[in-house]
Amino acid sequence: MSFFKTAVRRFSSTSITRGMAKAIAYSEYGNPKEVLRAVSYNVPKCSKNQVNVRFLASPINPSDINQIQGVYPSKPPFTNDVCSSKPSAVAGNEGLVEVVDVGDQFKGTFSPGQWAILGSVNLGSWRTEMNIDGRSLVPVDKSAFPSIAEAATLSVNPCTAYCLLQHVVQLNKGDWFIQDGANSMVGIATIQLAKHFGYKSINVVRNRPDIEKLKEQLKSLGATIVITDEELMDRKTMKQKVPEWIQGGEVKLGIDCVSGRVAAEMAKYMSKGATMATFGGMSRQPLPVPVSLLIFKNLKFHGFWVTKWKSEHPEEFLKIIHKVEDFYRNGTLKTVNTELVSLKEDADEKTFLDTFLNAIEGHGKKIIKFEH
């Protein structure tokens, strides 16, 4: 019997009581298949400074997986809130909730039926219900979103894209940037926001059998130029093409979520004094920066972590959330290439766990949508 099946049996009750909350939890770091388990627990009436919420949708982000593996810098507390037998953390950081009950302290801020998103990290979003400090919730207007997918993914990917375009370097209308991972959720949001702001872009994606279809999709969203990583590596052609594309303009910004050779190659086509912001490392390779780019082009390289940025600029980040909400409302932003995975909140624990594990292993962006 596999570890996770054993874990389900060990921490589950023998009969599931309708009305109990469920969560995906772990008490040690490691492979999600081996350490995750489903737990059922009671949620008491919320206290005066709490809001009782039920989860409508919980995205699965790469950082969530890294957190479970124990390799992510931000780590949740292990408590006995959902499992009395062993201190545990609830997985997930991003989530869309509906208010069910409101403690006295927040009755003027929240009301039953209202939508909100988690405003803090490490709260545990892969669950059906919780009591949460009202200060950790950000109310959102449900009418602003075409679907539940946009609202559920509001706080991470589009806000990261906004920060990368608006808070790394000063870009003016007509300026260029180059980005890898352009078909990632952040990349797609960056393309759409850049179109809105009037920025032009060179977008790098991995080659694939249906590459022309992908190129057309990204261009329809606002991408100026789309190339493959193989085309990027063709220096002779790139040295000819880039000047033709930018027509005397400047590539002031590089946006990198891949690192390795791809990011290093992108840097060669950035203008003097430009900045590359790295917010991911999907290649799991270091970034080999030629000394000449530092000395003769004065390029700047730094990391960007939206969690840290949010903690250092909480008021500004709240404004960004509402700006992004407006972008969804007016059609500037739309969510593409996402899959909603339905899960009944009263499903048995094995089904509950298996649904999350299958979503983790699958390809593309997955959002668990709880059916009430």
Swiss-Prot record:
It is found in: Mitochondrion matrix. Its main location: mitochondrion. The active site is at 72 (proton donor). Keywords: Fatty acid biosynthesis, Fatty acid metabolism, Lipid biosynthesis, Lipid metabolism, Mitochondrion, NADP, Oxidoreductase, Transit peptide. It comes from the Eukaryota. One of its GO terms (molecular function) is zinc ion binding. It catalyses: a 2,3-saturated acyl-[ACP] + NADP(+) = a (2E)-enoyl-[ACP] + NADPH + H(+). NADP(+) binds at residues 157, 183-186, 206-208, 279-282, 304-306, 365. CDD domains: ETR. GO terms for cellular component: cytoplasm; mitochondrial matrix; mitochondrion. Gene3D superfamilies: Medium-chain alcohol dehydrogenases, catalytic domain, NAD(P)-binding Rossmann-like Domain. Its EC number is 1.3.1.104. It is an enzyme of class 1 (oxidoreductase). Residues 1-18 form a transit peptide. Homodimer. Belongs to the zinc-containing alcohol dehydrogenase family. Quinone oxidoreductase subfamily. Catalyzes the NADPH-dependent reduction of trans-2-enoyl thioesters in mitochondrial fatty acid synthesis (fatty acid synthesis type II). Fatty acid chain elongation in mitochondria uses acyl carrier protein (ACP) as an acyl group carrier, but the enzyme accepts both ACP and CoA thioesters as substrates in vitro. Required for respiration and the maintenance of the mitochondrial compartment. This is Enoyl-[acyl-carrier-protein] reductase, mitochondrial.
